């Protein structure tokens, strides 16, 4: 199938500020900085995921698939899907009559994902779209399922992105947000902080020659809304029956909401 490449032409004109990790920056500056992070890490992204999580990210993603209720013939959006782990699984589930769109704002990540999936023989029911989560270029009521995995914390206007996802989701469809969150046990929080701020940047320097990007990763996780806050944001965007599961002691949470 022919690849689709879509980019928003809307200029970022706001002079408001936001956070890039622990640093306060202009909103348009965050967009550029986040883009640079993922241009830098794209080639080593999968290797670093396995190293950083000890491979547990595969179990988190499998749980996400299990909670998606995906069936043959459905239309799925893997938003911020990067190197395509979820897309690969959805492609097999929805089959020839289904359709999966792997969308990412970062063309370096999208290219890595496309090459990886094609090398694995995953073709035919997958399209690749470069798109901004805040301004999704799809019709209203279009997808049965939307997943956004380890991406939402990097989005500048999360509320706007959630409203955009709600718009393109079909009535009866579900959104699943897999993201780093807040550990529920204090001892785990202390160990996790030590790992994130000391070992993780060193690992990034050793494997990817990029300590700064992985320092941003740790900081972005701490700035991301906690479980209850994100649940409330989803409700404000229009999602109903919202709930979440804490995974690995809350280091990661899977949020789920429906459009009725």
Curated annotation (Swiss-Prot):
The entry's keywords: Menaquinone biosynthesis, Methyltransferase, S-adenosyl-L-methionine, Transferase, Ubiquinone biosynthesis
Q: Where does S-adenosyl-L-methionine bind?
A: 83, 104, 132-133, 149
Q: Which EC number(s) does UniProt give? A: 2.1.1.163, 2.1.1.201
* One example GO MF annotation: demethylmenaquinone methyltransferase activity
Q: Name one GO biological process term.
A: methylation
- Catalytic activity, per the record? a 2-demethylmenaquinol + S-adenosyl-L-methionine = a menaquinol + S-adenosyl-L-homocysteine + H(+); a 2-methoxy-6-(all-trans-polyprenyl)benzene-1,4-diol + S-adenosyl-L-methionine = a 5-methoxy-2-methyl-3-(all-trans-polyprenyl)benzene-1,4-diol + S-adenosyl-L-homocysteine + H(+)
Keyword Transferase among UniProt keywords = yes
Q: Which SUPFAM superfamilies is this protein grouped with?
A: S-adenosyl-L-methionine-dependent methyltransferases
Source organism, top-level taxon: Bacteria
Pfam families attached to this UniProt entry: Ubie_methyltran
Q: What class of enzyme is it?
A: transferase
Pathway linked to the protein = Quinol/quinone metabolism; menaquinone biosynthesis; menaquinol from 1,4-dihydroxy-2-naphthoate: step 2/2; Cofactor biosynthesis; ubiquinone biosynthesis
Q: Does the keyword Nucleotidyltransferase apply?
A: no
Protein family: Belongs to the class I-like SAM-binding methyltransferase superfamily. MenG/UbiE family.
Give a short account of what the protein does: Methyltransferase required for the conversion of demethylmenaquinol (DMKH2) to menaquinol (MKH2) and the conversion of 2-polyprenyl-6-methoxy-1,4-benzoquinol (DDMQH2) to 2-polyprenyl-3-methyl-6-methoxy-1,4-benzoquinol (DMQH2).
Q: What is this protein called?
A: Ubiquinone/menaquinone biosynthesis C-methyltransferase UbiE
């Amino acid at each position: 199938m022919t690849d689709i490449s879509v980019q928003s032409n809307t200029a970022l004109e706001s002079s408001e500020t936001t956070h890039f990790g622990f640093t306060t920056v202009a909103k348009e500056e965050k967009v550029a900085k986040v883009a640079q992070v993922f241009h830098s890490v794209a080639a080593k992204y999968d290797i670093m995921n396995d190293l950083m999580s000890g491979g547990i990210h595969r179990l988190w993603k499998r749980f996400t698939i299990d909670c998606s209720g995906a069936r043959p013939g459905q239309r799925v959006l893997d938003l911020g899907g990067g190197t395509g782990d979820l897309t690969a699984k959805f492609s097999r589930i929805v089959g020839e009559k289904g359709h999966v769109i792997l969308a990412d704002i970062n063309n370096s990540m999208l290219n890595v994902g496309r090459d990886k999936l094609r090398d694995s023989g995953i073709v035919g029911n997958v399209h690749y779209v470069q798109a901004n989560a805040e301004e999704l270029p799809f019709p209203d009521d279009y997808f049965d399922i939307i997943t956004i995995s380890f991406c939402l914390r990097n989005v500048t206007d999360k509320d706007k992105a959630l409203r955009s996802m709600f718009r393109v989701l079909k009535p009866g469809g579900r959104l699943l947000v897999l993201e780093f969150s807040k550990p529920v046990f204090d001892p785990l929080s202390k160990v996790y902080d030590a790992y994130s701020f000391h070992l993780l940047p060193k690992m990034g320097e050793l494997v990817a020659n990029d300590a700064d990007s992985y320092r941003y990763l740790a900081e972005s996780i701490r700035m991301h809304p906690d479980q209850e806050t994100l649940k409330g944001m989803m409700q404000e965007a229009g999602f109903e029956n919202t709930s979440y599961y804490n995974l690995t002691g809350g280091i990661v949470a899977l949020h789920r909401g429906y459009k009725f």
